[in-house]
Structures are given as structure tokens and as C-alpha cells.
A protein has these predicted regions:
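N-terminal first-folded block
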Residues: 13-15, 20-43
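General detector of folded, globular domains
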Residues: 29, 48, 109-113
Length: 122
């Protein structure tokens, strides 16, 4: 099971899960020793198979750091915080966390897009 480390020390994932707003992006960074990267990838793949079946799931993309890095970044889009909360607390998903390498750390955090005039739309 990964050790969870808050990405933002002032706003925890538990705080974010209380939000009732719509459309969110989950950013989750995982870190393992490079030698355990394949084990992390296998565990994440099994989790992603569960998550993509959940109501409100839109899409996901996994990224890996370059040059042999053991750092991964998952970017997942959900219709709402409620949909993500239901998926994250799903017993089937929670049971799969034990499949991650013991050395793994995970830092999940929820985001919303920000409009910056002339640069990007929300």
C-alpha cells in the first residue's frame, strides 16, 4: 500500500472530498525506486480498470518521469467531486491499494481549471 503524502499541507484531500462542485481534475504523483516502477505500473493499471468503470469517470492519462525516473503523474478527469469520492471510497478500489509496492508514495489532489485571458480557458 502506498504511503499517502498531502500535496498541499493546508488543504487535504479529505477537505477536498467535502466539496460538492462539478468537474474536477485529479493530479496524483507516485514515487517509487526506479527498480519498482514496473510493479507500480501493474498496480496502477489494475486500479485504472476499476476507476474507468465508475460513474462520472471521464478520462485518465499516466505520465512517467524521463531518464529512468521512478516518478509517475496521473491526470484524471471526473464529472464531479461526488463521483470521484464514490470511486475513491469504493471497497474494490480500496482493496487494490495493497497491491502497490510498500515503498510507493502517492500524493493525490483535486484541481479545477483556471481561465487566464489570452493563454488558456477554464
Amino acid at each position: 500500500m502506498p504511503t499517502f503524502i498531502e500535496m498541499d499541507r493546508t488543504v487535504t484531500l479529505a477537505d477536498q472530498l467535502k466539496d460538492e462542485g462539478q468537474s474536477v481534475v485529479l493530479i496524483n504523483t507516485f514515487v517509487v525506486p526506479p527498480a519498482e516502477a514496473e510493479a507500480l505500473l501493474a498496480a496502477w493499471t489494475a486500479d485504472a480498470e476499476i476507476m474507468k468503470r465508475q460513474p462520472g469517470f471521464v478520462s485518465t492519462q499516466l505520465h512517467r518521469g524521463i531518464a529512468g525516473s521512478g516518478t509517475f503523474l496521473n491526470y484524471a478527469v471526473w464529472d464531479s467531486v461526488a463521483a470521484f469520492r464514490a470511486a475513491f471510497t469504493n471497497p474494490e478500489f480500496q482493496a487494490r491499494l495493497a497491491d502497490y509496492p510498500a515503498s510507493a508514495t502517492a500524493s493525490p489532489h483535486l484541481f479545477r481549471t483556471v481561465a487566464v485571458p489570452g493563454i488558456c480557458a477554464a
